[in-house]
Amino acid sequence: MIPKKIHYCWFGGNPLPPLAVKCIESWKKYCPDYEIKEWNESNFDLNCNEYVREAYEAKKWAFITDVVRLYAMVTEGGIYMDTDVEVLRPLDDLLVYEAVSGFETKTRIPTGLMACREGQPLFEELLHEYDGLHFKRPDGSLDVTTNVTRITNACLKYGFVPNNTKQTVNGFTLLPQDYLCPKSYEDGKIYLTENSMTIHHFAGSWVSDVDRYAQELGKKLTFLPESIRGYVAMFCSNVHCNGFAAACKAVSYTHLRAHETLMN
């Protein structure tokens, strides 16, 4: 069983915004017997590896959180939630899994809500991937590869099919989008069903300029098939923000492999 523990991260020392306070209250309402643990500068080793140290020096809190959420789940087990995730009903049904999350779109694995048992092998693998990484590249630029990309890449290696259907990959169960993420990242609408347990509100404090531009552009590309709309928006956003050469470098194995799977 996954333990009744909710983890969240808050680095930088600023007060929690109103939405975060509201969401945490919803956790307490529907999960009253769960321990809630905040991870911050006081209880996490910011020198645990070069990636975390460099991300903290750059004040890129979201990328520190990418590591901390994995560390919390691997070492203690439980449910990790971003502070903009609202709980709609009890989460006990998630506790029976070895590890669980759900689709953020029809093709993307979200990281705003993830859960696993202590020591889950895939999550350990994902955590240790950061041990050999640097957040600051030799040329001074920052590696802003999201954990969505890293986790999706790892799952593709184990047979993940990006098609918004329930599946289990190396012990990691993925639920359809309506369970944990019924709010569309692209159009902002909420599509609740009887399955919906949480809403990720995408507050965007962590969102890069590239992601934010891609999100807005995606809303205008409705003439494109949904299966490729996000990829086109992300590529065009990279061109807009970073130039064509950088955009070409940013075309990830994740996007190519996912599109290939959808087309087959």
Region roles according to the model:
Residues 61-109, 113-118:
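GT-A fold catalytic core of metal-dependent nucleotide-sugar glycosyltransferases
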Residues 190-243:
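C-terminal catalytic/acceptor-binding lobe
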Residues 4, 18-21, 25, 67-74, ...:
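A structural signal for well-ordered alpha-helical segments within the folded catalytic domains
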Residues 39-65:
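Active-site-proximal specificity loops/subdomain of glycosyltransferases
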Residues 131-199:
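Catalytic core and acceptor-binding pocket of nucleotide-sugar-dependent glycosyltransferases
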Residues 97-148:
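Conserved catalytic core of nucleotide-sugar-dependent glycosyltransferases
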Residues 1-49, 157:
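N-terminal anchoring/stem segment of glycosyltransferases
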Residues 254-261:
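Conserved small/polar residues in nucleotide/adenosyl-binding loops
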